Amino acid sequence: MSSQIRQNYSTEVEAAVNRLVNMHLRASYTYLSLGFYFDRDDVALEGVGHFFRELAEEKREGAERLLKMQNQRGGRALFLDVQKPSQDEWGKTLDAMEAALLLEKNLNQGLLDLHALGSARADPHLCDFLENHFLDEEVKLIKKMGDHLTNLRRLSGPQAELGEYLFERLTLKHD
């Protein structure tokens, strides 16, 4: 059934928003997996786990923000299957941060593609929404993860486990 409030909101944009919601939920699911992996007793990097669990919450909130916008515009939320994380064992913090950076770059590309579609469909409300609520945050997060990767690589010498521990204690610990 068509919405009575729908105006200048193309079905292509509506479908792209639903796909982006799914991408955010998948990212949240992946970060939840990462967060609890690093919180395990045999990994015991609580600060790293906390970092990823916070990201899980942020991505879930992003999905909700997109869904609210979808309803405000007269679109319909279509929930797709959320794919499970690509792995259950994440290895070292460096490997996990590399996977997270790739995930964020994919999310950012999804946001950029949606923004381009909004521009092509003359939807200034969508473009403004993405600019105000997503694009800047995403770039800042990618930069932060890049910085973390640089520091993790610096510390991954012959005693990589010690470097990983120091990174967690000095960079991510919130005690």
From Swiss-Prot:
What GO biological process terms does the UniProt entry carry, in alphabetical order? intracellular iron ion homeostasis; iron ion transport
One Pfam family for this entry, by name?
Ferritin
Q: Which residues carry this modification: N-acetylserine?
A: 2
Q: What is its main location?
A: cytoplasm
| UniProt-annotated location(s) | Cytoplasmic vesicle, Autophagosome; Cytoplasm; Autolysosome
Instruction: Write out the GO MF terms.
Output: ferric iron binding; ferrous iron binding; iron ion binding
- Residue ranges of domain Ferritin-like diiron in the record: 7-156
User: Which keywords, in A-to-Z order, does the entry hold?
Assistant: Acetylation, Cytoplasm, Cytoplasmic vesicle, Iron, Iron storage, Lysosome, Metal-binding
Q: Domain of life, per the record?
A: Eukaryota
- Which residues are Fe cation-binding? 54, 57-58, 61, 64
Any one cellular component term from GO for this entry?
ferritin complex
Its family?
A: Belongs to the ferritin family.
Functionally, this protein is described as follows: Stores iron in a soluble, non-toxic, readily available form. Important for iron homeostasis. Iron is taken up in the ferrous form and deposited as ferric hydroxides after oxidation. Also plays a role in delivery of iron to cells. Mediates iron uptake in capsule cells of the developing kidney. Delivery to lysosomes by the cargo receptor NCOA4 for autophagic degradation and release or iron.
According to UniProt, the name of this protein is Ferritin light chain
Write down the species. Felis catus (Cat)
